[in-house]
Regions:
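Short, acidic, metal-binding catalytic loop of nucleotide-sugar glycosyltransferases
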Residues: 181-186, 252
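Detector for the c-type heme attachment site
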Residues: 70-71, 113-119
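Accessory C-terminal segments flanking Radical SAM cores
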Residues: 1-84
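Leucine-rich repeat
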Residues: 146-151, 176-180, 205-207
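Generic structural signal for well-ordered alpha-helices
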Residues: 179, 207-211, 243-250
Length: 254
């Protein structure tokens, strides 16, 4: 099941681990940016990712790609369709889309989440694990996970889309370091920015100044339900605040 994702994109997770894309079912084994690899460019150009591309070319069955496989079997659109349609004419690997989760820092404790994506869950996940509840893949190794934000040596000349996630990305100031790199390299105006946020806060002035520099921004307001049910689903959720911030995004000048 060939997919062009490994030729055009990479995702760096909260703990420095990497995946070809957000649909990939698991993390690539024994890969950590800042530990086994200096930066994402070193991994992107390295033998491990080249081997992964060859497996794609050979149409091997890759366990982590099960989501797109199931979508295809059921006649549904998939991320693979997105990559293959958008980048059908590419010839050489280059980082054209980048997905970054720099930490698990979050101000919500949602019932569908875990400590890997929200440090608010760490104490509970740890306690449940100690009581014998299997939290494999959910309990983070420590309360605060951080992923490197150093873009030195990373070739971003072909970048057209940057996705930032969390945790809650709008409370992670290190994303501003990424924006500054794009500005200094004079490419920020060529890049579309995608933000997935719980919409509990609105960006401050410093954030706004950077946001206006991007070619386009897409804001995904993450919500499970509204009103009292929303507050039950997501500890920290405030319907009134959500509505106010939604209006501010609608009127945000770009």
């Amino acid at each position: 099941m060939k997919c062009l994702a490994p030729w055009v994109t990479i995702r760096q997770d909260e703990d420095g681990s990497v995946m070809p894309c957000s649909s990939y079912f698991t993390r690539l084994k024994d890969v950590k940016i800042g530990s086994t690899h200096k930066n994402i460019q070193e991994f992107f150009n390295g033998s491990d990712y080249n081997d992964f591309r060859m497996r794609m070319c050979n149409d091997e069955d890759i366990k982590g790609c099960i989501e797109c496989k199931v979508d295809a079997e059921n006649g549904n659109p998939s991320h693979r369709d997105y990559w293959n349609a958008k980048y059908a004419n590419i010839t050489e690997p280059a980082i054209r889309e980048l997905e970054l989760c720099l930490s698990n820092k979050c101000n919500f404790q949602c019932i569908a989440c875990n400590s890997h994506f929200s440090n608010k869950w760490y104490k509970d996940d740890k306690a449940l694990n100690e009581l014998g509840v299997d939290k494999t893949g959910q309990l983070s190794p420590r309360r605060h996970l951080t992923s490197p934000d150093d873009m030195v040596g990373v070739n971003l000349d072909s970048l057209v889309l940057l996705r930032i996630l969390g945790g809650e990305p709008l409370i992670e100031p290190r994303f501003l370091n990424i924006f500054e790199v794009l500005k200094e390299r004079n490419i920020i105006q060529n890049v579309e920015l995608f933000i997935n946020t719980n919409n509990s806060i609105f960006p401050n002035k410093e954030w706004q100044e950077y946001l206006r520099l991007f070619k386009k921004i897409t804001i995904v307001l993450s919500i499970d339900s509204i009103g009292k049910l929303g507050e039950w689903n997501r500890h920290g959720f405030d319907m009134k605040k959500f509505t106010i911030n939604e209006g501010r995004w609608i009127n945000f000048p770009t």
